[in-house]
Amino acid sequence: MCRLLAYASSEPATLAPIVGPTLSDFVELSKEHKHGWGVTTCASIGGVQERERDLAPAVESTLFAEVASSKPTDGALVHLRLASKGLAVDLSNNHPFIHGDISFMHNGTIRPASSIEHLVDADLLAQLTSSTD
């Protein structure tokens, strides 16, 4: 399963001071959760600000280091991906996902996915952009 981290702050801050010295331990997990990462930042007013993703493990990604230290925000979702067996290692499968002004991520796999498709409106199914959302 993937590793997920989220935070909300009363003042804009970057991931590094919010998580503190244990951030390096979290990033080290990407040696095992090596199929990329994703981060969405948000504002309490206005919703999702931006999303950054990379297929490189966070521990090797200069982009992850930049996002963690230089993107102040009052909330973020962070995802380290360990791809489920049989699912593509593809940037489109790296969470967090965005729908409108909502960002979300999940952990785990439902197989077969077709077993729950009847629970989702057809217009939403048509908007899927990856094989994991």
Stretches found by the model and what they are:
Residues C2, I102-P112:
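Conserved beta-strand-loop-short alpha-helix elements that form
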Residues L15-A16, Q49-R51, G86-A88, A113-S115:
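Short helix/loop capping segments that flank catalytic or ligand/cofactor-binding pockets
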Residues D54-E66, H79-G100, V120-L124:
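Short acidic (Asp/Glu) patches
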Residues M1-V59, A76:
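Extreme N-terminus nucleophile/cap motif
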Residues Q49, K71-G86:
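Regulatory sensory and allosteric helical modules in signal-transduction proteins
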